[in-house]
């Protein structure tokens, strides 16, 4: 992002494939080294800024070592909405100057992402609220926004996707994880499932605020989260994955 702010966009983009390949090599090494102790899944977070990102994501996901990817939206009208107040203001202006319209545009782009990528996990569903004027607002009172939220949740449910209970929101000062309570309750009413995420960008952030995240889910009436379990496979083939539920009462024992 710093490279983008300096205008050196091309240099920023050119290094990404190299970093991704290095990540896969290291992930495979760790997966093999620790196979007797822990099952390591290999995945990536797929950015969706516009439609022409689709082919790139699908190509990356085809690698046999990749188990899954997270589909996320961090930009609206090509402008970051979670980086700082200045970028958020630019995105707001690009949407016409009103937050309600910016939220609508965010969820429309998210809908495009869902249709194009069908991600197994949807990242930080309501990231748009992070830098908004009122992150705790009841978005169900914005008719157009709420229609789009429900539309997207229904699509994720039909696709068999999961939402993150993403505790990075707590680390960044919000009162609730992503998604917020009104959205989480709507998702639960559709039979939706949650997986746990710290959205860590470094070792120090691993499992940050998981105890609070578990309490949040329990307050919603959720009693389990979901993960994926790999099955034995040949090295040149993708692993078969099975859904596995983890009771919160057991999960909490690791974060008391």
Language-model segment annotations:
Residues 1-86, 205:
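A metal-dependent hydrolase metal-coordination microenvironment
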Residues 19-20, 24-32, 39-41, 56-65, ...:
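Histidine/acidic residue-rich metal-binding segments in metalloenzymes
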Residues 40-44, 69-71, 121-123, 163-165, ...:
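Hydrophobic faces of well-ordered beta-strands that scaffold small-molecule active sites
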Residues 45-48, 74-76, 126-128, 168-170, ...:
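Catalytic metal-binding/acid-base residues of hydrolase active sites
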Residues 85-103, 129-142:
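Surface-exposed cleft-lining segments at the edges of enzyme active sites
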């Amino acid at each position: 992002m710093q490279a983008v702010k300096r205008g050196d966009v091309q240099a920023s983009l050119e290094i990404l494939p190299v970093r991704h390949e290095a990540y896969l090599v290291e992930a495979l090494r760790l997966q093999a080294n620790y196979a007797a102790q822990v099952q390591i899944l290999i995945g990536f977070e797929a950015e969706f800024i516009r439609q022409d990102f689709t082919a790139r994501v699908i190509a990356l996901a085809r690698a046999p070592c990749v188990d899954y990817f997270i589909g996320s939206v961090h930009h609206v009208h090509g402008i970051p909405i979670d980086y700082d107040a200045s970028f958020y203001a630019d995105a707001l202006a690009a949407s016409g100057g009103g937050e309600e319209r910016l939220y609508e545009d965010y969820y429309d782009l998210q809908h495009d992402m869902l249709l194009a990528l069908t991600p197994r996990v949807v990242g930080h569903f309501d990231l748009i609220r992070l830098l908004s004027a009122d992150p705790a607002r009841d978005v169900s009172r914005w008719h157009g926004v709420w229609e789009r939220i429900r539309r997207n949740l229904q699509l994720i449910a039909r696709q068999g996707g999961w939402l993150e209970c993403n505790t990075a929101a707590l680390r960044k000062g919000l009162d609730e994880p992503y998604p917020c309570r009104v959205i989480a309750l709507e998702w639960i009413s559709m039979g939706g499932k949650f997986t746990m995420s710290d959205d860590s960008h470094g070792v120090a952030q691993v499992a940050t605020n998981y105890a609070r995240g578990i309490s949040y889910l329990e307050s919603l009436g959720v009693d389990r989260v979901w993960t994926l379990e790999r099955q034995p496979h040949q090295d040149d083939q993708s692993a078969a994955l099975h859904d596995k539920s983890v009771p919160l009462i057991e999960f909490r024992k690791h974060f008391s």
